[in-house]
Amino acid sequence: MRFTHQKCGGFTGAKGEVKLMTLDPGHFHAALVQKTMYAQVSPTVYVYAPKGPDVEEHLKRIEGYNTRKDNPTSWQEKVYIGDDFLQKMLKDRPGNVVILSGNNRKKTEYIKACAQAGLNVFSDKPMCIDAKGNKLLQEAFDLAAKNGVIIYDYMTERFEITTILQKELVNDKELFGRQQKGSLEDPAVVKESVHHFFKYVSGNPLKRPGWYFDTTQQGEGVVDVTTHLVDMAMWECFPQEPIVYQKDVKIKKAKRWPTMITLDEYKKVTGLEDFPSFLKEKLDDKGVLPCYSNGEIIYTLKGICAKASVRWDFQAPEGAGDTHYSVIKGSKANVFIRQGKEQNYKPELYVEPPAGIREDEMADALKKAIAGLQSKYPGVGIESNGQGWHVLIPDKYRIGHEAHFGQVTQNYLKYLADGKLPAWDVPNMKAKYSTTTAALELARKQER
C-alpha cells in the first residue's frame, strides 16, 4: 500500500493568513490553543455556538488571556449565538481553519461537515468515541484528501520532553537493542495514566460542563485519554511508519470500569445544583453516578504486545496531580517514564537493564546516546541510581502541559504552510481511532 502526502492549498506562512473559527467550544482545550498569539494567525477569531454556559466559559477564558498581566494576548472574538450555529458558520465561512474542542458526541459530525465544505480542521482528541463515529471519521479523512484540506488532532504528548527522550533512546539500537515482542501477561510497551475530574487550569479551578460526566457525550475512558497512549506507542516505536489498522493492529483484551461520582462532587466541579435528567437515569440506588471513565486495552501493534490504561479519580491528594507511567522494553535496555510520589509527581525518565544484562554492559552505550543528544537537547545528563540510570532533564525543557498546546498549534500551522501532512500521519490517525473504538466494542461485549 502506497501513502502520499495530503495536499492543502492556499497557505504560504504569511502573517495573519490563518483565520480561526471556533465551533461549539465546550472544553478548556479550545481556549488553550489561544493562550498565546501566532504571527500566522489573525487576531480576529469567529465563534459559532449555541446559547449556554459552554460558550460563556470559553469566552471568559479568552478574556482572561487578553487581560492577564504577563504577556497578554489580543484576541478579538466575533461571536454568533444561535441553534443554527453550524449552518451559519458553513454559510458565512469568515475563516479557513475550524477549532473543535467540546461535546464529543457531536464532534465527528462537525469534522465531516467541515471536510465536506472544504474547511481545515484542528481538533482536540478524541475525534470520535464509538464505532459509528469512527466510520464517519474515516469518511471525513477521505473527504479532506479529496477537497485538499487538513484534519489534525492535538497530540500534545508528543511535545512532553520525557516522551521525546524516551523515543530517542528506544530508537538508538546500540543502546536499546531489538524491540521486545512481549505477551498478554507482560506487554513490551506499557502506557498508563491517572487523571482527575477536579483540577486547576491556568491557575483557576476548572469548571466542567454538566454533560462531561455523560459518557455518551464525552466518551468513555477507553476512547478518550487512551487516544494519547495509543498514539505514543505508534509514534515512539514505529516513527514515521504508516500503521494500517486492518493489517497491523489486533485487539486482544479490553475492559472498562466506572468512577463513582457523588452529587456533592458533581456540584463542586460543574457548579450545577443537581444531576441533569440525562444523568439521573444512570444513578445507582444510592444516588451516585457510575461514570465509565476508566479503561484498558491490550493489543498487538506490528506484532509487539502493548497495553494502554487510563484511570480517572475525582481529585488528586494534596500536593499530587495527574500521573503517567510508561515502559518500552528492548533486548538491551528498558526505558521508563515514572511520575509518582517519589518523583514529586513530575515525569522522570529512567534507563534500566533487562534481566540478563549487567548495568556496566549498558554504560558505554548510554553515555554515547546521551552525548549524541547534546546537539538537540544540551544539558541532558544521567546519574546512576542503583537500578540503572536516571536521565537528568534541565528545567528549561519542562514547559508544562498547557504550553504544549502552543507547540502543537505551531506544528499544525507549519503543515498548513507546507500544504501537506507527513505521509504517515493520516493513516496513523485512522488506525488510532479504529483501535480505541474497537476496544470499546470488545470491552462492552466481554461484559455481556
Regions found by a protein language model. Name each.
Residues 3-119, 132-152, 417:
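N-terminal glycine-/serine-/threonine-rich beta1-alpha1-beta2 phosphate-ribose binding loop
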Residues 10, 128-205:
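A contiguous active-site-proximal alpha/beta segment in oxidoreductase catalytic domains
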Residues 203-321:
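Rossmann-like dinucleotide-binding domain that binds NAD(P)(H)
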